[in-house]
UniProtKB/Swiss-Prot annotation:
GO terms for molecular function: rRNA binding; structural constituent of ribosome. GO terms for cellular component: ribonucleoprotein complex; ribosome. The keyword Glycosyltransferase does not apply. One of the early assembly proteins it binds 23S rRNA. One of the proteins that surrounds the polypeptide exit tunnel on the outside of the ribosome. Forms the main docking site for trigger factor binding to the ribosome. This is Large ribosomal subunit protein uL23. Signal peptide: none annotated. It comes from Pseudoalteromonas atlantica (strain T6c / ATCC BAA-1087). GO terms for biological process: translation.
Length: 100
């Protein structure tokens, strides 16, 4: 059993992009920004607990931070982890919270 407090910290935010929106419409997949040290089992358990849905599978990607220029100096954005969570048929997560 995974620590409940840890599960609440695993999922940081939904990741919104063209690719994520297309994946949600076509493949019933939701994309999240997650902790870098989170594993697939933790991500699955966290999504099932937080959003009360059934998860079919989880795929993860380590995203490298981009190098950005600020005038003559260079800076770097942080590396982060992205999780593609495939929901079972008939399951849905509504981030907009629409009523009615």
């Amino acid at each position: 059993m995974i620590n409940e407090e840890r599960l609440l910290k695993v999922v940081l935010a939904p990741h919104v992009s063209e690719k994520a929106t297309l994946a949600a419409e076509v493949n019933n997949t939701v994309v999240f920004k997650v902790l870098k040290d989170a594993n697939k089992e933790e991500i699955k358990a966290a999504v099932e607990k937080l959003f009360e849905v059934e998860v079919n599978s989880v795929r993860t990607v380590n995203v490298k931070g981009k190098t950005k220029r600020h005038g003559a100096s260079f800076g770097k954005r942080k590396d982060w982890k992205k999780a593609y969570v495939v929901l079972k048929e008939g399951q849905d997560i509504d981030f907009a919270g629409s009523e009615g």
